[in-house]
């Protein structure tokens, strides 16, 4: 039986992870769960899965949780709680918390020799070199939960990495595919949150609308698969049936296809390298799949993807700046403080102003993250 800790169990990926685990109760034991604010849902999860330990935002949330529960469970709090919970006896830590908050707990879990199922983008975007060096040193598995990276992992299995010509990440194009800059000047938050294919959290949905999500995935792919950025391409595939592809040096292309359901890559990360039948899963019906189309991304309109490639090429703390500026800019947009196109403008401005640190420590990364966010917040949150 695999012992599992889920960081961010009340979010989109966390709830779907527990949904998958419900199908395989005999294979998994939930050791720990964490939530930020959603004490009500966490209470239900505790009753259903009986974890030994949980962590919440602060002591107020901990007190709310104690009032909700009749059972005795250890409750940790704050960022220290996230770091402490991964030290408990477990085989796998699912990192589904959003933001830079996931970085130190992930590093701590790796140092403890635990395998990682990674759904947090910031970990590799900001500290890819540090994290992957540690993964190799500790000889643990770091498995992607993203559908695109899971697809690439599956397409690479059984093949020699030296034979890879390029990785091809697919993008749906988001709700504004085909639009030009002029069309996007006055788009609303609701329009940007209306993703055509995937049901996700608000932050990642906006990142999909700007194509920054795909930019983050390019950065993650470099570190996950140890490949240079000039061998990672992005293609827009509106149907979201092909989740990514690997092209080999003989011209062959291997693709992974599936319905747009996050439970598939979650299941693969939980059970790797085996596969099991998932109850309630919709299988592809090729008789209903009338076409698979592809187009180049519009880098002029969707500047965020270009900025991600640029940050990756520069390296060092520039990817931390990219991530921090995006996080604040998206928050400003969601709170109707800025317009949609200003997201890319704020990120580009932050990158231009940054004095890059080429070989950063974890402290450098966390400090740069805080500095960038504070600077943008001061300027726009008046």
Swiss-Prot record:
InterPro entries, per the entry: DXP_reductoisomerase, DXP_reductoisomerase_C, DXP_reductoisomerase_N, DXPR_C, DXPR_C_sf, NAD(P)-bd_dom_sf
Residues binding NADPH: 10-13, 38, 120, 122, 201
The UniProt record lists the keyword Metal-binding: yes
Catalyzed reaction equations: 2-C-methyl-D-erythritol 4-phosphate + NADP(+) = 1-deoxy-D-xylulose 5-phosphate + NADPH + H(+)
Pathway: Isoprenoid biosynthesis; isopentenyl diphosphate biosynthesis via DXP pathway; isopentenyl diphosphate from 1-deoxy-D-xylulose 5-phosphate: step 1/6
Residue sites binding 1-deoxy-D-xylulose 5-phosphate per the record: 121, 147-148, 172, 195, 208, 213-214, 217
Binding site for Mn(2+): 146, 148, 217
One of the GO BP terms on file: isopentenyl diphosphate biosynthetic process, methylerythritol 4-phosphate pathway involved in terpenoid biosynthetic process
Domain of life the protein comes from: Bacteria
Keywords: Isoprene biosynthesis, Manganese, Metal-binding, NADP, Oxidoreductase
Sample GO molecular function, one term: NADPH binding
Enzyme class: oxidoreductase
EC number: 1.1.1.267
Family listed: Belongs to the DXR family.
Summary of the function given for this chain in its UniProt record: Catalyzes the NADPH-dependent rearrangement and reduction of 1-deoxy-D-xylulose-5-phosphate (DXP) to 2-C-methyl-D-erythritol 4-phosphate (MEP).
Protein name: 1-deoxy-D-xylulose 5-phosphate reductoisomerase
Provenance organism: Thermoanaerobacter sp. (strain X514)
Gene name of the record: dxr
